[in-house]
Amino acid sequence: MNHSAPGNADKHGESLAARFAEAPHIAASTTDERRFESWLAELEPAQSARLEALLVQPFGRNILVGIAEFSPYLFDLVRADPLRLIRLLECDPDTHLAALIAEARGAVLAAPDEAEVMRLLRRMKAEAALLTALCDIGGVWPVMRVTSALTDVAVSSVQAALQYLLRQEAARGKLFPPNPEAPEEGCGLIVLAMGKMGAGELNYSSDIDLIVFFDPDATTLAPDIEPQPFFVRVTQGMARILQQRTYDGYVFRVDLRLRPDPSSTQVAISRDAALHYYEREGRTWERAAMIKARACAGDARAGEALLAEIAPFVWRKHLDFAALADVHDMKRQMQTYRGQSEVAVEGHNVKVGRGGIREIEFFAQTQQLIAGGRHPELRVRPTLAALDVLASSNWITLAARDELARAYEFLRRVEHRLQMVADEQTHALPDDREAVERFARFFGYPDREAFARDLLRQLEIVQGHYEKLFEGDDPTGTAKLPALDYSAGPDDPRLFQHLTTLGFKKPAAVAQTVRDWITGDYRVFRNEATRSAFIEFVPALIDGLALAEEPDRAVVAFDQFLGALQRGGRLITLLGQNRDLVALVALVLGAAPRLGEMLARQPQLMDGLIDPRFFGAMPDRRELSGRLAATVQDAASYEEFLDRLRLFGQESLFLIGTRILSGTVSAQQASTAFADVAEGVVHTVHDLVADRFAAQHGRIKGQETAIIAMGRLGSREMTASSDLDLILLYDFDSENPDSDGPKSLQGAHYFARFTQRLISAFTTRTNYGVLYEIDMRLRPSGRAGPVASSLASFADYQANEAWTWEHMALTRARVVSASAEFGERIAGVIRDVLTRRRDPATIANDVADMRRAIAQEKGETDYWDLKYAAGGMIDIDFIAQYLQLVHAHHKPDILDVSTLQVLDNAARLGVLPQSEAEILRAAARLYHDLTQILRLCVSDRFKPETAGTDLQRVMARAGDAPDFSSLEARVKETQSEVRRVFRALLEGTSPASAR
């Protein structure tokens, strides 16, 4: 029997009885079978005949006999109303449930008094309870459809009760709803469904967890009505309607204790008090609870607004591994309280016991808490949906997702069957074997042993995954390391021997450094909790640093890093929970001090290294845009928006840089990634500044603005230190030059002010530094020209005034932010300029003159100045630009913003000999590879004699050389070859120069 089967829900149109796919296991000739048969015989003949006709279907009789034998509660429902049972067996269950809920809501609206409301809701609940039980026991609905049906009944019941009460209050003149038919709209009362109700996963006999808030400033109350007493009374009335036991039973037990500080607060809490509590006192378990929170009744708009305001409490901006320990402590306390520390069968609690439902929920919720702030896609309510997203985002494996999902569905069915026995919110199996035997047969198993095998297998699978997340990796890192006194220093022979065994060449110096960490006066350790956490982490840290290519240098680099670190509690926790990153961080600190300084200033940059996507494929522009949008979407102010943009930019630089150092991306991939990040940031800033500027100054009729990327951003060849070369172009209806805002500006002045505002968004120094340095000297007339140009003046300048070097720069021009139509117009202007007929000799002379001028200004004798050295990258760029300007008129396919692509195009079109193209392509790739490393690791000129061996090793690997001296020889030889080609093309008589 498959107890996590998908159900028989797809056979729409057939009766429920015809869709049964499984049933309890009935032993031959039981007393309870005779009990069922005698009840059947007592029915009126017409009812008995209809029922017998339905029970000829497979499984139907065994389901009802099983109910009679194992579930007093369900058999009471069966006997109470035979016609109801017949109606259910004849119905399509999905259609019937929807109609049942709708009819009850309609009847409540017309109910004359509260007693009738209570009777209507209880009868709806009883019929829904029997229907969902039949669908669950008979395998008609998968278990999560059952939970969703139960949730639909609960939500509708809460809404109906609340709506009735608000209509009564309106009739008394205490409430003035804009829409009397829907008094909840705009009333300011918010009912949040929590837990399984919030996630649409309600169990069979569940309480419903609700929190009630109200917004006293946004109600429809009469002027003389105090909000809190009013809403407390309404909340109490709602709970009474739902849970008070009457002749017809109850609807749902209501639990209001998940509200802030329930022992000292009223059952309805003001919005401001709630926000203040969550901001100041909210605990991790309350954050976890809020993952599933959903506005289910009352003022829906106010509910969604409140959840948005609570979101920063739930979803932290940075990875939150502290939640891991908090949630695990909570779980241990529950197990201790309930005595559920081992997997078992008899007496085992399938909810909070080892391997139970709660461990699956905590497994998902904890990882949602850790990463949901950075990854909004993880903010889903249902447990199975959370497992799906965790798997698709690579936080867990697909195998783990599948195993946990199967276990979850199995255990939820066990839980339901336990609760169906007596309509009790129980989660524990019976304490004796005989009772478990009976339960197993109710669940469809032939005996206890068959059930126990399946149960224990699922519990052990869950326990294994849970322990791997919370316990198995030993967060302190000390389980597998020798018990040593790391504060003993170099005089301890055991520590000395251990460090030697790990591969440290200077164990005494390392031992002294470690003692300094533990006992010294580092700023980061002035917080005693941080020092204690670090001391626990030291064994794992030393183990990780020993894996670096040069362990002794890694220790020195980490020591310097600790000295620069202002605050580091989170960083120590992150490294402690992710010990495999220690060696990578050591590489970063040793080879790229610039990145180390960034990490010391902003320890949260580590978050990206822990993201499972870090070592996957580089994100494309679309994915980056999504991440950027998620980063800034809920910024509370313009200043916070700027901070988040800067943090996004710095983290992106740090992550791409780390991947360059670790050799997991090529230089070309890194160039593209840097450009994609910059382009996304430019587009985001452009849109936001435009909207803010328009709010103040309005818009001009027909206005368009565009940002053109030049230089390295234009060619998508950026490095970690590239600034942004930008030009801003605009257009508008010249006959209507005034903007329509409260502070109107005219024409060119409007766009000049807008451009200055745009530059400020990039260059203003905030707590997170500068976003990008902006260079606009490539605009028409350079520094002498206006900061923004109209498209018409730009086109005229390029056609009639621009110098050759400006047209060379234009070969890299690319529109990165504009409307599609305006962007195409600009691209057309650029294309027209570049495809003009030009004299090859004149262009060659201009390019050669410019190269000589740059050499005079910058020098060209330092062969490690890969850009300006004779035969360096400038030579290759100038060759590519020369070839485009000379040949684009009759071979427009040569045009491209990328130097490498231009060289490919030129060779393919026959305007550059293949041999020379190959020399230039190989050189460009080498220079790109090395330049990415140097821009990342060196802030000034590169000097081999002072470069550390970590950096030399990384450079040799990037240059595909066996060692650094071989790399030097290759660089010199390459520059000689490139300079030869440059002279042949631009200073000599090569056929390519005039072809």
Swiss-Prot record:
Protein name (Swiss-Prot/TrEMBL): Bifunctional glutamine synthetase adenylyltransferase/adenylyl-removing enzyme
Location of region: GlnE 2: 637-853
Role: Involved in the regulation of glutamine synthetase GlnA, a key enzyme in the process to assimilate ammonia. When cellular nitrogen levels are high, the C-terminal adenylyl transferase (AT) inactivates GlnA by covalent transfer of an adenylyl group from ATP to specific tyrosine residue of GlnA, thus reducing its activity. Conversely, when nitrogen levels are low, the N-terminal adenylyl removase (AR) activates GlnA by removing the adenylyl group by phosphorolysis, increasing its activity.
Gene: glnE
Protein's UniProt keywords contain Mitochondrion: no
GO biological process, one term: regulation of glutamine family amino acid metabolic process
Pfam families named in the record: GlnD_UR_UTase (PF08335), GlnE (PF03710)
Classification via NCBIfam families: PRK11072.1, PRK14108.1
UniProt cross-references to PANTHER family, sorted A to Z: BIFUNCTIONAL GLUTAMINE SYNTHETASE ADENYLYLTRANSFERASE_ADENYLYL-REMOVING ENZYME (PTHR30621:SF0), GLUTAMINE SYNTHETASE ADENYLYLTRANSFERASE (PTHR30621)
InterPro entries per record: GlnE (IPR023057), GlnE_rpt_dom (IPR005190), NT_sf (IPR043519), PII_UdlTrfase/GS_AdlTrfase (IPR013546)
Taxonomic superkingdom: Bacteria
Species of the source: Bradyrhizobium diazoefficiens (strain JCM 10833 / BCRC 13528 / IAM 13628 / NBRC 14792 / USDA 110)
